């Protein structure tokens, strides 16, 4: 390793170590690439240059004949890895003493910070106090909607968003959140309405157009899906979800979209969607192995489940069933397979599956377990449903 860190960049972790003859520069690369490493002193004079090939997990070492105090900058192919200048920022770290936290805005700020930290349960009291101070405070209503969506109270989130829209019908966040809640509630027209208004703004255009593409693909309107997927990429070319929707809509229109798959692969080389789609298009053993061989983590079943649920969310049940049939499987997967096929025999198998160390957390699994409870009444589906809540 680097035995410490002087700086961290998107190219790698860098450390400088003083030696008897100068300074050893150690870089632990984050990606495989060929680079030109250039070292400058504090006057800006280049004192060393080396071309090298980097690979993750293989630290690169280079020694220069000057002390660490004399170094000014280390560059890698035009990207700064380390600098000797003072990078202390001027951003304030303490709130003004005369700021009144006991206001709708003050409580919203506290709640919003906690949401950014993903402390949703701790954020909710502040959101409630915010709209308690002012029941028509739109940011507070939006924050409450976010928190209700997070715990799958879609109707509550929808109601909060509608109250915000009653105050400001063009508020972008309220429209987007209303669309998300309506989408989960099956209120497709309301969802489209919210996303269309949210898409008028730069902040929400990409996300809203991505959601609209999903709705159109799910409804079988693939040409509209293509249009909105393309719009989602304007100003956000690395929107992988938008690229996936562009591929799906194009594929459903029997259009060649291999270039889209390649674009996703360039952005995210380990994306399971890319490898599965190549297997789906050509289901031979080579493509099957290529898909499954890179799912190597300790909870591989979650990769399969996540991909299958995504396919199901856009109406691609056949693909979802195929993904789950290739999964190592667990109790949640078993219930999903029974639900997708509405198969009594698969449900009976799920009802005797081992639920040890199975901890469902996705809201999409709620209707699956509710269906299983209604169909068989086995304790396992009730237990797993309770874990989601």
Task: Label each region the model flagged.
Residues 140, 174, 208, 242, ...:
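TPR alpha-solenoid repeat register
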Residues 2-102, 274, 283-284, 346-348:
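Long, contiguous interaction/recruitment modules in multidomain scaffold/adaptor proteins
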Residues 100-133, 303-314, 355-360, 384, ...:
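Alpha-helical segment of the N-proximal tetratricopeptide repeat
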Residues 133, 167, 201, 235, ...:
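Structural marker of alpha-solenoid helical repeat scaffolds
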Residues 118-125, 150-163, 184-197, 219-231, ...:
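Structural signature of tandem alpha-helical TPR/SEL1-like repeats
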């Amino acid at each position: 390793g680097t035995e410490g860190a002087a700086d961290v960049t998107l190219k790698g972790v860098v450390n400088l170590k003083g030696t008897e003859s100068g300074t050893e520069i150690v870089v632990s690369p984050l990606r495989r690439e060929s680079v030109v490493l250039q070292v400058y002193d504090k006057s800006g004079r280049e004192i060393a240059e080396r071309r090298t090939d980097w690979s993750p997990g293989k630290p690169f070492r280079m020694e220069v004949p000057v002390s660490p105090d004399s170094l000014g900058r280390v560059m890698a192919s035009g990207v700064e890895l380390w600098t000797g200048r003072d990078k202390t920022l001027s951003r304030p770290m303490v709130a003004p003493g005369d700021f009144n936290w006991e206001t709708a805005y003050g409580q919203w700020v506290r709640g919003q910070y906690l949401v950014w930290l993903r402390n949703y349960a701790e954020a909710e009291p502040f959101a409630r106090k915010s709209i308690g101070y002012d029941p028509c405070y739109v940011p507070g209503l939006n924050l409450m909607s976010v928190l209700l969506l997070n715990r799958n109270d879609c109707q509550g989130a929808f109601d909060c968003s509608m109250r915000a829209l009653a105050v400001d019908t063009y508020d972008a966040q309220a429209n987007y959140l209303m669309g998300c809640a309506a989408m989960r509630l099956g209120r497709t027209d309301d969802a489209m309405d919210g996303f269309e208004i949210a898409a008028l703004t730069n902040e929400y255009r990409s996300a809203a157009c991505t959601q609209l593409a999903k709705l159109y693909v799910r409804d079988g309107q693939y040409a509209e899906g293509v249009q909105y997927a393309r719009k989602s990429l304007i100003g956000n070319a690395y929107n992988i979800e938008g690229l996936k929707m562009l591929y799906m809509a194009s594929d459903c229109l029997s259009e060649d979209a291999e270039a889209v798959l390649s674009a996703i692969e360039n952005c995210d080389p380990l994306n399971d969607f890319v490898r599965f789609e190549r297997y789906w298009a050509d289901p031979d053993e080579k493509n099957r192995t290529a898909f499954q061989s890179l799912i190597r983590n300790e909870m591989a079943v979650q990769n399969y489940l996540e991909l299958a649920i995504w396919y199901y969310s856009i109406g691609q049940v056949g693909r979802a069933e195929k993904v789950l049939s290739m999964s190592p499987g667990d109790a949640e997967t078993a219930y999903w397979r029974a639900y997708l096929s509405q198969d009594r025999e698969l449900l009976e198998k799920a009802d005797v599956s081992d639920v040890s160390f199975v901890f469902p957390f996705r809201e999409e699994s709620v209707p699956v377990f509710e269906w299983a409870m209604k169909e068989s009444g086995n304790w396992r589906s009730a237990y797993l449903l309770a874990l989601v809540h």
